[in-house]
Amino acid sequence: MKAETKKARWVWLTGALVLLTLGALILSALLDKPLQGYMERKLNARLKGYTVHLGGVRFHPFGFALDLTDVVIVQEANPQPPVAWIPKLSASVQWRALLYGRVVADFLLDRPAVYLDLRHVRAEQKSRVPLRERGWQEALEAIYPLKINEFRIVEGDLTYVDEGPFRPLHLSLINFRAENIRNIRSKEREYPSDLYLEGLVFDTGTVRLDGHADFLARPHIGVKSRFTLEQVEVDYFKPIVSRYNIVLREGTLSSTGELEYAPHIKVIHLQKLAVEDVQLEYVHKARTAVAEKRVAKKVVQKA
């Protein structure tokens, strides 16, 4: 009799757990669509000059996790093509932080792709609102109720297309990790969070950042990091130097150094700069003659 009673209890307990699980899944599915509309409104209320469209939102009640899928970001001045597409953005509780009595979040951007061209850049230059004040940090923080402690990007992609017959500037397989973000507000030029970034430049060169950041700095984050560029094709710099009548052909660039970029300081210290097999020409153009004379005059004055 006792064995039958115990068996019945297990049957009821198992049934209750199954029903609870099914109920949670059904509730989650019913909430997804309303949550998607709410999340879009919340994000767009914080952004200036940009609009977010969400393909879907999925809440996972058991892990208290949130997935945003097919996230598309457009610049309102130039809505086509979009400036960013994120197949999946996941936010969840950082469970290991609970061991230290901290209730914080992990954020993961899976294979995000960013596309910029000269129209996007010129629209930013004309705008009265600086890019750093567009509300990006506020929008990111609005996604999840917990404060972000770890932020990761896996296999990101960045493309910039300039005018003229230049190859697009392309960074691929970008992996980024920032930890200990929700530290206390730091004094100026103190960077409490660890960060690391690596990626490919033009499929052959590499870029690495290894340093620290202050993600609570305002109006934008502060970074102090060592950097390494290895075997980067000079094609990467053609659109930039062409504005100064300089033509680059072939060759690679490698460099190491330190950079500091924060609200009150922007400094780069080069420790090594190596340029190999580069062909460089200066081309005089009639339409830039006045600007050339102005630059030459400044050089003479400084000399």
Language-model segments: which ranges?
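Structured catalytic/translocation cores of nucleotide/phosphate-coupled proteins
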Residues: 39-43, 53, 140-142, 194, ...
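Elongated, acidic membrane-bridging lipid-handling scaffolds
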Residues: 12, 129-236, 241
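Amphipathic hydrophobic-ligand
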Residues: 49-51, 68, 77-92, 131-134, ...
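N-terminal type II signal-anchor transmembrane helix
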Residues: 2-47
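Short hydrophobic/aromatic-rich motifs at helix boundaries and adjacent loops
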Residues: 10-15, 27-28, 42-44, 62-65, ...
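Flexible beta-edge/linker motif
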Residues: 56-123, 136-161, 185-192, 256-283, ...
